[in-house]
Curated annotation (Swiss-Prot):
The keyword Repeat does not apply. It comes from the Bacteria. Belongs to the YbaB/EbfC family. Homodimer. It comes from Shewanella sp. (strain W3-18-1). It is found in: Cytoplasm, Nucleoid. This is Nucleoid-associated protein Sputw3181_1707.
Length: 109
């Protein structure tokens, strides 16, 4: 099925892709994305590894009810996580040449 050179070349390509993916995963883990809610009144900065780095709350929200503020913080966190997922897919598509991961398979973070 494969000649000696063909199999060796295939293994070399697989190793190169694995190295590129590892490098890309490190890059993704270091990146930061900002999620927003309430038209920018609440902002959450999250790393590619889904660690929340910073929460910014507009002072005008401190006078409103606690439950609404909690909802806005949760929405901003979810927005940041969604942006990270989109960015990860785009970055990995660069490495894999647009080849999609199988459904349900996620990045190892």
């Amino acid at each position: 099925m494969f000649g000696k050179g063909g199999m060796g070349n295939l293994m070399k390509q697989a190793q190169m892709m694995q190295e590129k993916m590892a490098k890309m995963q490190e890059e993704i883990a270091r990146m930061e994305m900002v999620g927003e809610s309430g038209a920018g009144l609440v902002k959450v900065t999250m790393t590619g590894a889904h660690t929340v780095r910073k929460v910014e709350i507009d002072p005008s929200l401190m006078e409103d009810d606690k439950e609404m503020l909690e909802d806005l913080i949760a929405a901003a966190c979810n927005d940041a996580a969604r942006r990270i997922e989109e960015n990860q897919k785009a970055k990995m598509a660069e490495v894999t040449g647009g080849m999609q991961l199988p459904p349900g398979m996620k990045m190892p973070f």
